[in-house]
């Protein structure tokens, strides 16, 4: 297993709602958040990497849409996820 696969499986295990859950909004948002955080560190060193920045903005938009969906479906799960991930300070 690569390092990325190990990190991914750890995140899925932490945020999964069930044993084989990989597609719930909580898991998807958590995976996107870890990738966004890794890219944020990358951009501190590579400020002119505009091609990757476009991908970052796309991930942020996707996370925002998933959070909006979750907020509309179940506000309690939304609040718990935001608190667990440390978003919205």
From Swiss-Prot:
Pfam families: Ribosomal_S15. It comes from the Bacteria. CDD domains: Ribosomal_S15p_S13e (cd00353). InterPro entries: Ribosomal_uS15, Ribosomal_uS15_bac-type, uS15_NS1_RNA-bd_sf. Keywords: Ribonucleoprotein, Ribosomal protein, RNA-binding, rRNA-binding. SUPFAM superfamilies: S15/NS1 RNA-binding domain (SSF47060). One of its GO terms (biological process) is translation. One of its GO terms (molecular function) is structural constituent of ribosome. Part of the 30S ribosomal subunit. Forms a bridge to the 50S subunit in the 70S ribosome, contacting the 23S rRNA. One of the primary rRNA binding proteins, it binds directly to 16S rRNA where it helps nucleate assembly of the platform of the 30S subunit by binding and bridging several RNA helices of the 16S rRNA. HAMAP family: Ribosomal_uS15_B. This is Small ribosomal subunit protein uS15. It comes from Paraburkholderia phymatum (strain DSM 17167 / CIP 108236 / LMG 21445 / STM815).
């Amino acid at each position: 297993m690569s390092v990325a696969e190990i990190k991914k499986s750890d995140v899925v295990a932490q945020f999964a709602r069930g044993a084989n859950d990989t597609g719930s909004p909580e898991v998807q948002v958590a995976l996107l958040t870890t990738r966004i955080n890794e890219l944020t560190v990358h951009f501190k060193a590579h400020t002119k990497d505009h091609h990757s920045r476009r991908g970052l903005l796309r991930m942020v938009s996707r996370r925002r849409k998933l959070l909006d969906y979750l907020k509309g479906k179940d506000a309690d799960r939304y609040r718990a996820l935001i608190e667990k991930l440390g978003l919205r300070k």
